[in-house]
């Protein structure tokens, strides 16, 4: 696949979301000629953010609001001989998340383990000891699980080879996440607080593999981080870095099709007819949308990306989003808040498959960034980002009525997490339903967390980063291995870059696989304390 005469290869990246930006930095840093083609005028994809108010006085994030394991992001910059701190500033949060429960109690999760033990002591005298045991189990699991199951291409069933699996068997990956956590804590409040990220994998703690206990572990071990200026600023910083490395950006330029000739991706055709040639194409867009809309149907025949196969796949829930600009600041509350209602513990089929909207007492998440970073609002003002899980558009939901009901109910719901009197402080507001995600952001079925992470959609059974059927075509993002979430999206970009550097005769991607050590090794991590 190397270009004639050993010249620098040209890679087109479709989409300037976090996966595309990570791929652009990786590839430009290794000497590839990179062109990023993005339909929007600003970078970020779902991470681009939005502004509220006649003069844009409120700025809010629309996608990720949590950065885990910042060392992975640092390493993307470092391997390109750049410093992350020259482009963005990361802020560690003192409290990861305050989780409110159905019984009126709450738990503050934190990377400060002495304080975490004190928090858990409120739930029983044995909980601090249980935490120490669970963290020790996590330390043993983390290095093995991260490298063997996340920092790997998973391109064939060798992913499940006995030599690979043997070191993990003592962690009982066949257990559910609920059973694994309950085996230590024996309290549904603690178990569901630590297991709640499974919702964003398209699963329930009682159906999610215990392998994913690495997610709450790394949040307690490394903390949760915010990007100063919001995650939209991370998009801009990554774009600046890629440009500094020589990448070219074509913004406001939608792609009509990926061009395929004799089974090989040879470039893209832009809306309007312009043709761009390339040696390889990296697509960073919602996988099901991109396959159906950008890849010719005849090139997908017999693959796992046919329209029929994508219709049969299982997808995550969607979300109803409320974005508020407020004329007050809730400075006494943490950055991240979760309410777990009694319905979060439901295990009936309707609940497990996200069939209906819960309008009575839904669980929800709130981002209150002004307490950490006042840059998104005028002095004395702030923003809130409220997320309520809902079915995706594959379910028969009246979205107009759902929006009307939740617009009315959310201000009162917020009192359950200590946000009192929100209704009278709202100055600007915007709402997204599953249909917004589908129609405005090109997310198939509005399933914002992409393909569910069921056993039949994990590892080599999940769509590949390197497409098997079209040479030179790569997918990065939440729909491919290793899965949804900002951290794993960045790892999918690392996987794509590793393939491309090898195939260009440059050898493996430098410094990858990379498993951030449990002890701080960088200025950014060291600042977390």
Swiss-Prot record:
PROSITE patterns: PHYTOENE_DH. It is an enzyme of class 1 (oxidoreductase). It comes from the Bacteria. Pathway: Carotenoid biosynthesis; lycopene biosynthesis. Its cofactor is FAD. Keywords: Carotenoid biosynthesis, FAD, Flavoprotein, NAD, Oxidoreductase. One of its GO terms (molecular function) is oxidoreductase activity, acting on the CH-CH group of donors. InterPro entries: Amino_oxidase (IPR002937), Carotenoid/retinoid_OxRdtase (IPR014105), FAD/NAD-bd_sf (IPR036188), Phytoene_DH_bac_CS (IPR008150). FAD binds at residues 12-45. Belongs to the carotenoid/retinoid oxidoreductase family. PANTHER family: PHYTOENE DESATURASE. This is All-trans-zeta-carotene desaturase.
